[in-house]
UniProtKB/Swiss-Prot annotation:
Cysteines joined through disulfide linkages: C102-C200
CDD domains in the record: MnmA_TRMU-like (cd01998)
Protein name, per record: tRNA-specific 2-thiouridylase MnmA
Subcellular location: Cytoplasm
Site note Interaction with tRNA, residues: H128, Q335
Organism: Aquifex aeolicus (strain VF5)
Positions contributing to ATP binding: G6, M7, S8, G9, G10, V11, D12, S13, L32, G127
Free-text function comment from the UniProt entry: Catalyzes the 2-thiolation of uridine at the wobble position (U34) of tRNA, leading to the formation of s(2)U34.
UniProt cross-references to SUPFAM superfamilies, sorted A to Z: Adenine nucleotide alpha hydrolases-like
GO cellular component, one term: cytoplasm
Gene Ontology MF, one: ATP binding
Amino acid sequence: MRVAVGMSGGVDSSVTALLLKEQGHDVIRVTLRFHTVEACEVNETHNVCCSPKDVQDASRVAKRLGIPHLVFSWEEIFKSKVIDYFVEEYKRGRTPNPCALCNREVKTGFFARYLKQVADIDKLATGHYAKIEEDKKYGLVIKRPKDRKRDQTYFLSLVRREDLELLTFPLGAYTKEEVREIAKRYGLEVAQKRDSQEVCFLMGKSPGEYLEGILGKQRGLIKHVSGKVLGEHEGVYRYTIGQRRGLGISYGKPVYVIDIDAKTNTLIVGEEEYLYNDKLLVKEINFHVPLEKWENVSAQIRYRHKPVPVERIEKTEEGFLVKFKEDVRGITPGQVVAFYDGDVLLGGGIIEESVK
């Protein structure tokens, strides 16, 4: 089988290539460059997966394994599909998840179809901690990995169902410690390389700092849910639902961001009780499994949140209304909601709003 391995220069993708080569597959390594070389060189001190050193690491590992290494410069595609979306969502007072969108529109689903055409691959493999398996009940699906601490299925919930047959995630059967041990055993230089922890195009900046450089300061009011004005902010794009720190106001007791009104440039804050709700609206769901087959459904509204049992999902004129069996804290417009039956990823969508 001819397999392309998406390569960032880190230990995960390096071991992915190694495992596939050991299994006897025809392996090529492919690296997507999303940023200009100049930008990456200026910010090489930050732990992001784009620098010239990362590309060099990828090339060294490919040479060590005796496989070809191709580099694609997709700066414009990445900007139009991910960065522009990121900026527009924040302008609307929402909190997007650029990594989930990138997996769908650029480096996983879209890239697999592109490589199928230009390189005649059978599969695209990445270093994601997830599994793609044939499930007796649901068919071909993504499942949670062995290493639950590294579980990346949430970020894959927007990948199109038709792209799953082109993808494979070999690391789903390993823990991170086992992956590093394999790299060490085979003498790969990247065995102890640090993981990339940041949104790559932010280059070490916070979202607020990055967006201020594009949008400038946009001062507006901070209001309590009661209507009382408590202070001013320098841009609603600096805040997300549930945020407490950095508000710069004094109220006598803790208050959190409850809502963001981008039209009036107003930040709404209130006590923690206002963060809880049991319903959300999703305009569209990306189905890995048809809705009528879903059973024992739980939903995860942020990457580090635990899944919460779902009571029902109703199709409405506005989209899909999701009703939880209990109140959920911090439902955030723009974030991804991923749906599961146990370990099986059923699908996902982008939260439109919290519904009272």
